[in-house]
Structure formats: C-alpha cells, structure tokens
C-alpha cells in the first residue's frame, strides 16, 4: 500500500503541489443576456470599507498574492435583495494588474443579508518586483435579466 502512495505522489507534478490553493470568494453570476441596460431602479452599492494588502517576500506558496477586500452594503428601499444581484467591476483610471478585475458579473455564493464582502486576489510578486498601483474602480449591481445600476467608485492605491 505504501508503494502505491509513493507511485501516486511521484506522478503529481511538483509545480501542481506548490501552487497556491487560495482563491477569491467570488463566483460567476448567471444572467439571461450579455447585454446590459442601465436602470435607475438599481442604486449604487454603498462602499463601507476597502482593504488593500500587497504581496510579501516570505517563502510560503501564497505569500506573493495581493488582496483587495471590498465591503459593501446594499441600500434599503431597493426592490431587489442583495442575493438577487451580481456585480461587475471596471477600471476607470489606472492600470490593474492581471487577474485583479473579475471577468464578467460575479456574486458571493450562498450570501444572505444586506452586507457582502468581495475578496479579489492577484499575483503581486515580491516587494522588490511590485509596481505602484493607483486605481479608480467602479462596481455596479446587475440583475439576472441584465439591468445595471448606478456605479460606486472604489479607490485603490499604494506604493509597493
């Protein structure tokens, strides 16, 4: 039996074993159409807090990940609940590192309530390799039938 485990261990590439398993908490949000129609029925989400953490120079596999955490609250009075919505991100100013901005519309699976936290990650590199990052992002709510709400702006910035 030990021989079987040893053989299986040897067949797994070392690179796959060393890959960082941490990922964002976001998942794709299904919409019935790829077209978006701006709607005044959807308010902008309220940005409560933005946390921005650069990658580290440690020896652990995930140390070079950067983290951007955006905590939002859905305004009262909307005819939509937060769990009925997805969110789309776009860069208004600056250049986002590859992998930071989610492709398409995203949601946090299983979420309930008026508050939500989006965890975005990217390969930030070691501190000596990092570029300064100053971004202005927009985040908008999107319904399953393609209605898109007003944007909220998120400022992200910091020297490496």
Predicted regions and their residues:
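Short, compositionally biased P/S/T/A/G/V-rich stretches that sit at domain boundaries
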Residues: 19-75, 160
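Solvent-exposed serine/threonine-rich low-complexity stretches and specific carbohydrate-binding patches
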Residues: 98-114, 155
């Amino acid at each position: 039996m030990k021989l079987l485990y040893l053989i299986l261990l040897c067949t797994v590439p070392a690179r796959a074993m060393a890959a960082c398993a941490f990922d964002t908490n976001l998942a794709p949000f299904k919409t019935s159409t790829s077209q978006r129609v701006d709607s005044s029925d959807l308010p902008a989400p309220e940005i409560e807090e933005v946390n921005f953490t650069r990658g580290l120079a440690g020896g652990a596999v995930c140390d070079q990940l950067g983290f951007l955490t955006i905590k939002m609250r859905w305004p009262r009075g909307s005819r939509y609940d937060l769990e009925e919505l997805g969110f789309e991100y776009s860069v208004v100013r600056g250049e986002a590192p590859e992998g930071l901005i989610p492709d398409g519309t995203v949601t946090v699976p299983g979420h309930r309530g008026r508050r939500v936290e989006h965890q975005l990650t990217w390969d930030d590199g070691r501190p000596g390799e990092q570029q300064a990052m100053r971004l202005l992002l927009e985040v908008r709510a999107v319904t399953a039938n393609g209605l898109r709400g007003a944007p909220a702006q998120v400022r992200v910035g910091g020297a490496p």
